[in-house]
């Protein structure tokens, strides 16, 4: 599958299109074929390693000391369930979904992404396009949790 990856921090030019292995869902995971994703301020800050001075050490430990620990950015996405693990009951192949990748180690800039069944993943509202659904994830989660 194709993915946009980065192996060092820096300007947008550090992003590269690469061929990587397609993930296989484990027994409790859902494999999503990505139809839409976004570019958030979080993605830009992770890519460039532009963080507030007081958070520098924590950010380096979380994101990667010498280079990105998680090479595929993308904090939100929308797509279609392609496969499910053996014990998954909430989702079926063909379900349209939208999700936050924050708790799933990012990865929205890839053609496929695995999520735990109990992750931040929900059925996409029928009245939203995949692009609209992907763009509503972080704002919607913020509204729900505040």
Indicate where each model-derived feature is located.
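Extreme N-terminal starter segment of soluble prokaryotic enzymes
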Residues: 1-2
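Short beta-strand-to-turn element immediately C-terminal to the catalytic PLP-Schiff-base lysine
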Residues: 6, 82-83, 114-116
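Proline/serine/threonine-rich low-complexity linkers at boundaries of modular beta-sandwich domains
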Residues: 9-10
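Well-ordered beta-strand positions in beta-sheet-rich domains
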Residues: 17-19, 112
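Glycine-rich beta-strand-centered segment in the early N-terminal region that forms part
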Residues: 21-38, 50-103
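Cytochrome P450 core scaffold surrounding the K-helix E-X-X-R motif
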Residues: 42-48
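NAD(P)H dinucleotide-binding glycine-rich loop of Rossmann-like/cofactor-binding domains
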Residues: 63-76, 90, 99-146
């Amino acid at each position: 599958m194709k993915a946009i990856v980065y192996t060092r921090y820096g300007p947008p030019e550090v992003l590269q299109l690469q061929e990587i292995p397609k993930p296989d869902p484990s027994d409790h995971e859902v494999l999503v074929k990505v139809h839409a994703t976004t570019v958030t301020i979080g993605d830009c800050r992770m890519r460039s390693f532009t963080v507030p001075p007081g958070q520098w050490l924590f950010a380096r430990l979380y994101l990667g000391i010498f280079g990105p620990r998680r090479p595929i950015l993308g904090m939100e996405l929308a797509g279609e369930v392609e496969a499910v693990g053996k014990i998954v009951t909430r989702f079926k192949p063909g379900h349209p979904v939208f999700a936050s990748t924050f708790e799933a180690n990012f990865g929205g800039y890839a053609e496929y992404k695995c999520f735990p069944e109990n992750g931040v993943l929900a059925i996409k509202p029928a009245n939203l396009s995949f692009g609209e659904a992907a763009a509503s994830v972080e704002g919607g989660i913020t509204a729900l949790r505040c």
